[in-house]
Each structure stands twice: as C-alpha cells, then as structure tokens.
C-alpha cells in the first residue's frame, strides 16, 4: 500500500479530518501495519496502551467481561479507531478480530501528531495571517474563531477573516485528498470583534470525487455569515486558458501599500480630510503585502475607471505547503479591495460613501501559493440600485490563471455605518 493510499485512508477517519494534509502525510510515514487472524486479540483489557489503532480492513469487536453487570459488545469496522480512554495508560476492554483484520497503529511516541494547532500544524513559527485563521475545535463539526488584537478590523470583523476562517472550518471536515475548487458566501450581519465566532459545518455530501459543505458563522446566537464550498479530488481532464495576464511592472519594483500610504499622508497637495483618513488606514495592520500596479494618487474625490491591478502575497512564508492553507489565505486577502472599485466612476469632491460586501465567490483553477506574488486584476462592469458588481482574475508569475472571482457590494452615498451587531442592509 503506497503512501498516497494511506493518506487517502487516513483522510476518511473522522478523528483525523480536522488535521491538515501535512499532518496526515507525517502520520502515514510512521504508522505500523498490524495483521490479525479471526479470533486474535488486538489488545487486552488492562494492557498498557501502545498507541492508537485505525481499522484498515476487516472487522473487530470490543468486549467487556461477561460477568459485568452492564456487559456490552461494540462492533468496529473500516475507518473506526481506538486507543487511550478514560482509564489512562491501560486499555479498558478486549478488542478481538472477528474477521481477518488489518490495522494501522500510531505508536504513543507519535501521538502529538493528532494535536490541532491551526489550518497548518507545522511546528514552524506562523505568520500573522495563520494566527488569524486559527480555529479551536469544539466538536466534530464545530469550531471557534477569534479576532486577534493585531488583526485588521475597521471597527468590525473584516470580511476576509470570515471568509478565510469559514473556509478553513469546512476544509477540516473533508478528506485531505479533496481540495476546495469553489465557494460562494454571503455577508449577513456585521461581526463583533470583541467576541468569538462559532463556525458550524454541515456535511452536505461526500462522494468519490467531490464533497460539499455549508458553514454558518454565528455570534450571540445569530448567523452573521454563511458559506457553501465544493471540494474535489485531483483528476486528469481537458486543459485550456483563454485569459492572458496583462503586462505589469514586477512587484519588486513597486511600493508596498504601507509605504505608499505613508507618502500620501505627508503630501501637501492632497485634501486634509483625505490625509487623515489615510493615516487611519496605516494604523490598521494588514498581514498581506500589496503593491499597486499604477501610481495611486487618487484622493477618492475624482472619477477614475472601474479597474484595478495589484500584486499581493502573505507577509512572511507560510508554515506549510498544504493547498488548504494557501487557498484560505488567498480567500482572506481577496476581500480587502474588490467591489469597491465600482465607486471609481462616481466619485466627486465632498462625496461620502459607505461600501459593504454582500456576497463573494471564488473558483480555484490551479494550485496557488499565497506566500508568492499573485496578480489580482479587477474590473467592475456595472453598478446599479446601490449595488456595485466586480469580477476578478488572479494570475501567478508564470501567467497562469489560478483563481476567478466575483463580488457584489452595497454602495450608499451619505450614509454613516456605525459598527454594531445589526443587519448589514
């Protein structure tokens, strides 16, 4: 049995579905194959625990002494598991093979591999965006997310945080060989940065090649955000690409967003109110390095085309190569500057506008690295009835189209949106 087959098997074990693929690969490298004939004891009651057993083939039975008052038998089959129990370092029951049986044994020395740390479980130091995406497991399909003190907030939970955390929660419930290829989400209520967010995952479908999940994000008992995601096992098929990456300066030649904003703050030709607003933006940390392709001297008081191009990548190297992690980070970054470009043709001096994301969709076409440069090309084809619509394409440095996106936002003039736990509309 090759490593890939072992990883695929482990990805179907409920206990392990909350772990990233890197953990499953490491577990597959250290598990021991154990074979038993019918009637053999796998473990004996009061025997010292030697690890966690995963049933690969065949069936087994859990037996307690027949003389006990509450004598019970529990059948075990493929994907079931057992190990440490309430009695600590000894097994609490006999486990007997009722057919020819094959188990994978994760020795106690490697039990730390079962611990959950984040989307990635690497022991390396995590960068800020990984800390933001960290989820605490509460139950099999329930996770708790937080808004760290150094996370971008803008007075409320940043929309990309909801997207990234919800997608991370969904990814933890899918076997590791299936990777998200698209998702659609809706922003329902403003999130409160001062309280945790509960992510409840619903397993809608698990097929041979595809899996579907829905996720509801809740605060104070109310659903503030919902996401539907589809996952697919890697397959061979037709390949073509019509979209061409536009010519742009290399990201290394462009100013980081923070440095560009610093220059705008001290530019005397710009309106004072605008410079004060920029100063506020600088104070908000953002874990993504952004480089705008065109000189951005807009005061948000002048009309401009509804288009934008910028390079982006995570600040710092991500601790893992797991595609689940990288796609969650790209999803996190995608909400910062997107449908708001629909405002560009309508700006004028003194105009006050509020913009809030309504829905957001992404399609992943090819593997991505969120800690390497990606070009985000955005166009807004229309705005109507207080809604702006934008489409986006993301290219890697090879010119490959890796992600397609759409977003719609509500755009309102002369409305002040106060941070609150209320409806977004």
UniProtKB/Swiss-Prot annotation:
Subunit structure, as described in the record: Homotetramer.
Catalysed reaction, written as an equation: a fatty acyl-CoA + H2O = a fatty acid + CoA + H(+)
Active site: 335 (charge relay system), 357 (charge relay system), 407 (charge relay system)
PANTHER family: ACYL-COA HYDROLASE 1, ACYL-COA THIOESTERASE
This protein's name: Acyl-CoA hydrolase 1
Enzyme kind, highest EC tier: hydrolase
Motif (Microbody targeting signal): 423-425
Highest taxon of the lineage: Eukaryota
Function text: Catalyzes the hydrolysis of acyl-CoAs into free fatty acids and coenzyme A (CoASH), regulating their respective intracellular levels. Active with both medium chain and long chain acyl-CoAs as substrates.
Family statement drawn from the similarity comment of this UniProt entry: Belongs to the C/M/P thioester hydrolase family.
EC number(s) from the headed UniProt entry: 3.1.2.20
Binding residues annotated for a nucleoside 3',5'-cyclic phosphate, in chain numbering: 15-83
Pfam families the record matches: 4HBT_3, 4HBT_3C, cNMP_binding
PROSITE patterns, A to Z: CNMP_BINDING_3
Residues in coiled coil: none
Lineage: Eukaryota, Viridiplantae, Streptophyta, Embryophyta, Tracheophyta
GO molecular function: fatty acyl-CoA hydrolase activity; long-chain fatty acyl-CoA hydrolase activity; medium-chain fatty acyl-CoA hydrolase activity
Gene from which the chain derives: CNTE1
Localization (cell): Peroxisome matrix
GO biological process: acyl-CoA metabolic process; fatty acid metabolic process; protein homotetramerization
């Amino acid at each position: 049995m090759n490593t890939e087959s072992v990883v695929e098997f482990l990805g179907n074990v409920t206990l392990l579905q909350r772990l990233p693929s890197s953990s499953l690969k490491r577990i597959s490298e250290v598990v021991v194959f154990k074979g038993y004939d019918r009637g053999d004891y796998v473990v004996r009651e009061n025997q010292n625990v030697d690890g966690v057993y995963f049933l690969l083939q065949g069936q087994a039975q859990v037996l307690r002494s027949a003389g006990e008052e509450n004598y019970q038998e529990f059948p075990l089959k493929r994907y079931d598991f057992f190990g440490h129990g309430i009695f600590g370092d000894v097994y609490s029951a006999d486990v007997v093979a009722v057919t020819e049986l094959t188990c994978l044994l994760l020795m106690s020395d490697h039990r730390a591999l079962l611990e959950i740390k984040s989307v990635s479980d690497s022991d390396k130091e995590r960068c800020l965006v990984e800390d933001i995406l960290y989820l605490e497991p509460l139950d099999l399909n329930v996770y708790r997310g937080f808004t760290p003190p150094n996370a971008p907030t803008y007075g409320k939970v940043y929309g990309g945080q909801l997207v990234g955390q919800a997608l991370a929660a969904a990814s933890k419930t899918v076997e590791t060989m299936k990777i998200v290829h698209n998702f659609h989400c809706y922003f329902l209520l403003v999130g409160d940065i001062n309280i945790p967010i509960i992510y409840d995952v619903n397993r809608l479908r698990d097929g041979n090649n595809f899996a579907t999940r829905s996720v509801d994000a809740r605060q104070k008992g109310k659903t503030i955000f919902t996401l539907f995601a589809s996952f697919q096992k890697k397959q061979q098929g037709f390949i073509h690409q019509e979209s061409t990456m536009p010519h742009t300066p290399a990201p290394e030649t462009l100013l980081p967003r923070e440095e560009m904003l610093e220059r705008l703050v001290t530019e005397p030709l710009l309106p004072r109110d605008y410079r004060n607003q920029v100063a506020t933006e600088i104070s908000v940390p953002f874990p993504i390095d952004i480089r705008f392709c065109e000189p951005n001297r807009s005061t948000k008081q002048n009309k401009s085309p509804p288009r934008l191009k910028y390079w982006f990548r995570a600040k710092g190297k991500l601790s893992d190569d797991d595609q689940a992690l990288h796609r969650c980070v790209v999803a996190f970054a995608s909400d910062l500057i997107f449908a708001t470009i629909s405002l560009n043709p309508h700006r004028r001096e003194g105009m006050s506008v509020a913009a809030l994301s309504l829905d957001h969709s992404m399609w992943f076409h090819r593997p991505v690295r969120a800690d390497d440069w990606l070009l985000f090309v955005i166009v807004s084809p229309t705005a109507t009835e207080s809604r702006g619509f934008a489409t986006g394409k993301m290219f890697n440095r090879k010119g490959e189209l890796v992600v397609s996106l759409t977003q719609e936002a509500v755009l309102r003039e002369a409305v002040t949106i106060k941070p609150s736990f209320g409806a977004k509309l």
